[in-house]
Amino acid sequence: MTRLMTRLSVFSIVAASVVWASLAAAETHEIKLIPKNVHWGYYSRSVAPILRIQSGDTVSVETMLAGGRERLRLAGVSDSEIPESLKEVDRVVTDRGPGAHPLTGPIYVEGAEPGDTLEVRIVGFEYLHPYGVSGFIPNSGALPNDFPYDHFMLIRFNPAAGTASFRPGVTLPLAPFFGSMGVALNVAGRIPSGPPGAHTGNIDNKHLVAGSTLYIPVHVPGALLSMGDGHAGQGDGEVSLTAIETSLRGTIEVRVRKAERLRWPRAETPTHYITMGLHPDLDEAARMATREMIDFLVSEKGIPRDEAFILISVAVDLHVTQLVDGTKGVHAMLPKSLFQ
């Protein structure tokens, strides 16, 4: 069956025909970085939505870097270089935790119901300040016993060139993305912003740059989408605990895919389909990502299950998304070029 194609080829989820929620009269919205738009350190169904949108709407969302002003202080950022909006959020939003990530949201998406999938198209990013920070704290990251102290670096950007200066002689490419994008779960209390999970959240997947699409399972009416943890660049693994942490204005387009149930988040880029595994045990995370890819190949490409397993072995790359969030991540990347 020929599937509906959009600006990006759609990473379809079920073999049934695609059913879109109404896309009539799509609008563009803007969410500023101000205290009332931020919940710090958690996802929760109890947080009142700050915006209601229709399927197909576009939203520009301002976010604050993980750790807030204190993270900037540790890297030696002068107070005069910190935007006033960040200072105000840091001063006013005192109800925090258990995580360290200021999140902007939630956004209520009309028509989204449990059992649906939220399609979040990543349109683009801008920096709220021309620098980021990266480093580690004691007893953290992939080498918790090797560095019993904290150390943070200020990394300045050249946005026009798309680069960042790490140190003399070392230049990094800029590739901004939201480390955390997620929805509320239908459970009481706060879901910590650190570990990713069924709500998606802090997946720290470096491929979710402009031009990519993230597919998030919906668990509560309206989905209650929030985002934050801006990264200007990251390596697979994120081994020190941090990427290039920065504050981003991200533009997204949100659509509801009715009755297309996912167990775990998926994604796609212009060149790859991506499935994910999230588990405290890295081996189990790899198995989850592999099984998710098998399910995709069976349902969407019509490949028998046993042959799908073999195809993954010969053509799909498994990457360690991150090792440091408690719940580890592995993502499988399937080249679209395999399919004629």
Give residue spans per PLM region:
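N-terminal, Lys/Arg-enriched amphipathic/low-complexity engagement segments
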Residues: 32-96
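Short, Lys/Arg- and Gly-enriched loop/turn segments at beta-strand edges
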Residues: 66-78, 125-135, 222-232, 322-324
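Intrinsically disordered, low-complexity linker/loop segments enriched in Gly/Pro
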Residues: 101-102, 108, 123-209
